[in-house]
Curated annotation (Swiss-Prot):
SUPFAM superfamilies documented for this protein: HD-domain/PDEase-like
Gene from which this protein is expressed: glyS
Localization annotation: Cytoplasm
NCBIfam families recorded: glyS
Organism of derivation: Ruegeria sp. (strain TM1040) (Silicibacter sp.)
Classification of source organism: Bacteria, Pseudomonadati, Pseudomonadota, Alphaproteobacteria, Rhodobacterales
Keyword Protease: no
Catalyzed chemical reaction(s): tRNA(Gly) + glycine + ATP = glycyl-tRNA(Gly) + AMP + diphosphate
UniProt keyword terms in alphabetical order: Aminoacyl-tRNA synthetase, ATP-binding, Cytoplasm, Ligase, Nucleotide-binding, Protein biosynthesis
GO molecular function terms attached to this record: arginine-tRNA ligase activity; ATP binding; glycine-tRNA ligase activity
Name the UniProt record assigns to this protein: Glycine--tRNA ligase beta subunit
Length: 687
């Protein structure tokens, strides 16, 4: 057994590509080695800005010898057929074996492929991996043909056994493999040799390189939070930024700096976004006031002045960036507080195309405002406020701040609406109408915000359905699945009672409401599946009238799911399916529909009479419960049918020799189907 160490050392790899590149290196190497017959015990990939590292433990020293037996042509077959078989097998005639088979004597060839040394296989697999590496973007440099994300300087490829280490010989476009690497670009640039992974990791640490990105993340976060805590502040959590910054440095040195006082009155979100997007700084806030007061930057080296020069340079650049943000903020506020107010931005949206088949943003805003007014009574919102909020909700798209930082849309709308003196409900709707943006995003609950959020998403969906721009497979360029999930969460979280087909018709003339509703049902299945509700239970409820009322549909599905998990539910389902199958076969055979009601005077068996009584007693109760939307009570009525249905099938033969009795019993089965069908279409439930 041997351990393999690979390092591909290059110029700086973009942070966003490092994690994926490490996994690609691991997968391509291990897949290639296993395919060639080299199994292994474990493998892990590590990355820094300048290196991709792969360590494989417990690798076989040789691939195993493989024996393959091939059946050839019959003895006495045409010479050309035999020669073709020999060429394919790489053998001569005297190496073939004749064997008797039921079809006569046949030639057999035994081909033996000897095992190969691990180093030989590794060199082949690594060269193929490097030459065909799936970088999202790559480059060529110098006169070579190799493509890599940044110029590749060296390849470390080392096999380590108990008796020592050996370099796996390899040469790609002038880059030759070896046993050496280099430390930190500035603090320890000299190259040094290594003997294995442990030696490699230890020497890199001494050369100011932290190899593990998770270790770099932990070190950055610990130092940042400690420095902030010492000043009575706290770092704003941002896992995405933390991972990115860890991919920018090999030896993280955390520095905390101050923000000039003239910028402290900017909205905290503006400060945070500007520092993150332009400088990759963490924001440090005062937990009592919520104000951003300082920043954290991460340097890639230690300096004699403990980072003072680095910090001063960063503060200078940051001040220039924040001066721009302050200029945008003050200009936007001046407009918002003027006579024209935020409505003044709407005119320019008439020149902004939303989609070439759906018109401008201004036209879309008019549609959303009209729809929000229609939806308002359903969600308990004031219709005038909902319409007003919808008209100004996207006004900030014309502001300078949102032009610079598109991710602040909505949030800046709230600030500007407040500055313009608009009602707080309107200002809140400006921010919240985009929500929920994802499965973990909070759902708005203020009625005006809910009305505008629903109108915004439904306008998007009905519009793209009207022009036949629907999601296909994995492609969803307009995020319509996310919009549908947003509508579902808004409706369910706020217990909104509305028929979606009616809303679709009001939203956009020409939209296919039935097809769009089916799309919603598919998204609802995905949403409820994560909550433990089976897809067939949802299908059984979708088949019922009023399935475009999602709140009612989910209420029914949850009650049915609970019932189907009970013993009564499982047994009643079997009884229903048996009744439905017998009835369907009889109706097909007889060419009639047995739905005229059974007559008690033709009853012959006590179990039959008991089923009559149970159906009569529970049908009205189930119907009343369904009308009252008390699905738990309806399921209780269904549970009461379980015992008499079981007893009926235990004691009674439906297909009696007496045609009158048979017809009466089939009509009784029809009554079972009818009563159960009030709750859901149980024929769609599996089991």
């Amino acid at each position: 057994m041997a351990d393999l160490l690979i390092e591909l050392f290059s110029e700086e790899i973009p942070a966003r590509m490092q994690a994926r590149a490490g996994e690609d290196l691991k997968k391509r190497m291990t897949d290639g080695l296993v395919e060639a017959g080299l199994t292994y015990a474990g493998a892990h990939a590590l990355t820094t800005p300048r290196r991709l590292t792969l360590a494989i433990e417990g690798l076989l020293d040789h691939s195993p010898t493989v024996r393959e037996e091939r059946k050839g042509p019959k003895v006495g077959a045409p010479e050309k057929a035999i020669e073709g078989f020999l060429r394919g097998a790489g053998l001569t005639r005297d190496q073939l074996e004749e064997r008797d088979t039921p079809k006569g004597a046949v030639y057999f060839a035994t081909i033996e492929k000897p095992g190969r040394p691990a180093a030989e296989i590794i060199a082949e697999v690594l060269e193929d991996t490097i030459r065909n590496f799936p970088w999202p973007k790559s480059m060529r440099w110098g006169a070579g043909a190799l493509r890599w994300v940044r110029p590749l300087h060296s390849i470390l490829c080392l096999l380590t056994r108990e008796e020592g280490s050996e370099v796996v010989p390899l040469e790609i476009d002038g880059v030759t493999s070896g046993d050496s690497t280099a430390g930190h670009r500035f603090m320890a640039p000299a190259r040094f040799a290594v003997t294995g992974f442990e030696d490699y990791a230890a020497k890199l640490k001494r050369a100011f390189v932290v190899l593990d990105p998770k270790e770099r993340e932990a070190a950055i976060w610990q130092d940042a939070t400690n420095q902030a805590f010492a000043s009575g502040l706290e770092v704003v959590d941002d896992k995405g930024l933390l991972a990115e910054v860890a991919g920018l440095v090999e030896w993280p040195v955390v520095l905390m700096g101050s923000i000039d006082a003239e910028f402290l009155d900017l909205p905290p979100e503006v400060l945070q976004t500007s520092m993150k997007e332009h400088q990759k700084f963490f924001s440090v806030k005062n937990p009592k006031t919520g104000r951003i007061e300082k920043f954290i930057t991460v340097a890639n080296r230690e300096t004699a002045d403990n980072g003072a020069t680095i910090l001063a340079g960063n503060q200078k650049v940051l001040s220039a960036r924040l001066a721009d943000a302050k200029f945008f903020w003050e200009n936007d506020l001046r407009i918002a507080k003027s006579e024209v107010g935020v409505e003044g931005w709407l005119e320019s949206l008439g020149n902004v195309t939303f989609h070439n088949k759906l018109g401008t943003q201004a036209a879309r805003i008019d549609r959303i405002a009209a729809l929000a007014r229609e939806i308002a009574p359903v969600v308990g919102a004031d219709a005038d406020l909902a319409e007003q909020a919808a008209k100004v909700a996207k006004a900030d798209l014309s502001s300078e701040m949102v032009y610079e930082f598109p991710e602040l849309q909505g949030l800046m709308g709230r600030y500007y609406a407040q500055a313009a003196g608009l009602p707080q409900e309107v200002a809140n709707a400006c921010e919240l109408h985009y929500s929920p943006l994802g499965p973990s995003d909070d759902v708005p609950t203020e009625p005006v915000s809910v009305a505008v959020a629903l109108a915004d998403k439904i306008d998007t969906l009905t519009g793209f359905w009207a022009i036949d721009e629907k999601p296909t497979g994995s492609k969803d360029p307009y995020a319509l699945r996310r919009a549908a999930l947003g509508v579902i969460r808004l409706v369910l979280s706020n217990d909104v009672r509305v028929g979606l087909k009616e809303v679709f018709a009001k939203a956009y003339e020409g939209a296919d409401g039935s097809d769009l509703l089916s799309f919603f049902h598919d998204r609802l299945k995905v949403f409820l599946r994560d909550q433990g509700i089976r897809h067939d239970v949802i299908d059984a409820c979708i088949a019922m009238e009023g399935s475009d009322d999602l709140t009612l549909l989910v209420k029914r599905a949850r009650a049915l799911e609970d019932f189907m998990k009970s013993e009564d539910g499982e047994n009643l389902l079997q009884g229903f399916k048996r009744a439905n199958n017998i009835l369907s076969q009889a109706e097909e055979k007889d060419g009639v529909e047995y739905s005229f009601g059974a007559d008690k005077k033709f009853v012959e068996d006590p179990a039959e009479a008991a089923l009559f009584e149970a159906l009569a007693a529970n049908e009205a109760a189930i119907s009343t419960a369904i009308e009252a939307e008390d699905f738990a009570a309806a399921m209780g009525g269904m549970a009461a049918l379980r015992a008499p249905v079981d007893a009926f099938f235990e004691a009674v033969q439906v297909n009696s020799d007496n045609p009158v009795v048979r017809r009466n019993r089939l009509n009784l089965l029809s009554q079972i189907r009818k009563v159960c069908g009030q709750v859901a279409d149980l024929s769609r439930i599996e089991g």
